[in-house]
C-alpha cells in the first residue's frame, strides 16, 4: 500500500462489488479503486462468516469455540494490515488503492483535502458501527431459532467485539497532525511491528493471524504503490506512532480476553439467551468509536453480567435439586402412610383375636363372670325363679346364703349339656356331717375301681370255666379209650394178632408186625 495522502470521493455505486461472492473478489483486489465503501463490504463479508458460524453452532458446541478463535485471528489480521495506511482500507475488505499522481503538499487545496481526510475516516467509522450493530441484531434474531440460543448469542457477541476492534483501530490510525517532512513508513515494517500481537497469550494461532496469500497485493501492485514514495518521499505522511500502536495492542488484548471469557460462559450455562449481553455489545461498539480507552471498563461490565448469569444458572439448578428432594420426601411420606395402614390392619387383627378369646372364655367358663347376682328370670340363672349369687366361683341362692349352718350344694356347669344347670348326681347331702360326703371325683374313682375288680372277677371266672371244660374233655377221652381196649380183647381173633399200638405208624397204615392186612383203628 502507498502511504501518500490523496483526495478521495465517495462512491455509493461500489457497494455491490464488495458483497459479491462473499468477499472473494474483494480479497483478490478486483473492487473499484478509491471507494471507501469497500470497508463496509469487508464488514459485510465478516458478518456473513459470522452467520455461517452461527449455523454451525446449532450442530456442534465445540466448533463454536474454534470459530470464535478464528474470528479473533481474522480481526487481528485486519489490525495488522490496516495500520499501515492513513485510510481505513484493509486487506480483507479492500483491494488496491488507486494510483494518483503526487501533488504538492504545500498547496492549499491539497492541505484542505488532507485535513478533511480524518473527517472522512470518522464517517466511515460511523458506518462501520452501524453495520456492526445491525449485524449483532441479525445474529440475535437468527440465533433465536437454534437449539442452543446461548451459544449462538455468545458467538454474535464475539463478532461484535471484533467489529469494535476494527473501529478502534480506525480511530487510532487517523493522523493527529500532518507532518509533511516525515519519512515514509512501508507496509512491511508495520506488519513486523504488529506481528507480536499474534504471539500474545490469547490462544491465537500464528498461522491463522497472518493474511492469506491471495489477500496480499501482487508484486506489481507493491511497486506501483512504492513508486510515489521513492520519487517524492517528503510528501508522505507518517503512520501512527508506535506508542499509539502499542495502546491499540493493549486494547485488543483486553477485548480478546473478554471474548475468551464469553467462550468459557458457553461451558457454564446453556439454558436461555441473555439479551442484556447483546445490548452491552452494542454499547461497546459505540464507545469504541468515540474513545478506545474505555474498552476496558465496558469489557469489565460485560464480565460482571456474565458472572451474574452464571450465578443465576447455579441457583436455578439448586432449585431443581430442591424440587427433586421434595418429591422424594413426598414419596417417603406415602410409604410411611402405607406402613401406618399396615399397622392399622395388624391392630384390627389383634382386636379380632381378642374378641374371639373373649367369646371362647365366655363359652367355656361362665363361672368366672364378674356379675355377682343374676335375676330370677335370667337365662343364665342356675336357679330359675330364685336370685342366684356368685361366691368363690360357685352360684348359690339367697336362702342358702342366709342360712348359717347350711351345707352348700354347688351347681356345676356341664359343657356336654350347654345352657342347663344340673345338680351333681353323686353329691350326698349330709346336713349333720358334711365331712362324710365324698366328692364326685372320689366316687368316680371308686366306681372305676369296682368296675375293674368286677372285670377281673369275670375274667377269673371265665378262666375257671375254661379249665373245667378242658378237664372234662380229657376225662371223656380217657374213658373212650378204655372202652375200645376192652372191646378188642374180647374179639375171636385175639390169639392170631399181636397187641396194637395206640399210635398209628405214619409211613404205613399197618400196625401188625407180622404184616397182616389189618388196618389200624
Swiss-Prot record:
Residues 1-356, 429-451, 467-521 are annotated as: Disordered. A lipid is attached at residue 2 (N-myristoyl glycine). Residues 97-108, 149-161, 174-206 have a biased composition (Polar residues). Residues 13-23, 37-90, 114-148, 162-173, 207-262, 276-356, 433-451, 467-488, 495-514 have a biased composition (Low complexity). Keywords: Lipoprotein, Myristate. Disulfide bonds: none annotated. This is Putative uncharacterized protein DDB_G0285119. It comes from Dictyostelium discoideum (Social amoeba).
